Amino acid sequence: QKVMRRTFVIAIFIVLFILSTALMDSASSQDKPIVLKLGHAVAPEHPYHLGAVKYSELVAQRTKNKVKIDVYPSTQLGNERDMVEGLQLGTIDLVVTSTGPLGGFVPKMFIVDLPFLFRDREHAYKVLDGPIGRDLLDAFAAKGIKGLAFWENGFRQITNNVRPIEKPEDLKGIKIRTMENKVHLASFRAFGASPTPMAWSEVYTALQQKTIDAQENPIAIIYFQKIYEVQKYLALTG
């Protein structure tokens, strides 16, 4: 079975509402382009960023340059939780984030972080692109946020500096970084690991200084964030 983490694109609902009005005004008054901020947590080489840049290009093209989206990678606008809060405050317009922090805003989102929830990639797409996924996205409206779509982040793999991980018991005693997510914490405790919540921006240094032993992420993040420089073992747990 597979563990799949799917990413989540969200934007403030009120910004989308104002945007339609502003575009009509802009068309008649020739005002400057509307500039929106889009933030995410990973490196500029990651598919998140490449997709966000392409998205900004398409928006500019289809609005005839009336709307411009500036993309901020690598937690420039804060960690993922900070950026979601920024949506509510109106300081950020769009965010691409993992599902990890979202249960703190909409509790039903914790369901997608359960281990072994999906049989395979096709199953995940069918669920999240269907009525269940739409219901999860719509739940954010009550928080002043508009859920737009799910993006794929990949399968979760574990890296560590202690020993090869070949079976669940091998996780016993390993201090592994997780997000501040009660499902993640409970899952790793059940395997005997010692989960340690930590902001993503602190993980590389924490691994380097041996404050933690391990972390888990899809291969793209492990590669583009250069986690291999500070980790010895990779377990394809996804």
What are these regions (language model features)?
Residues 28-123, 131-132, 138-238:
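N-terminal secretory/targeting leader peptides
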Residues 1-35:
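Short, low-complexity disordered leader/linker segments with a strong preference
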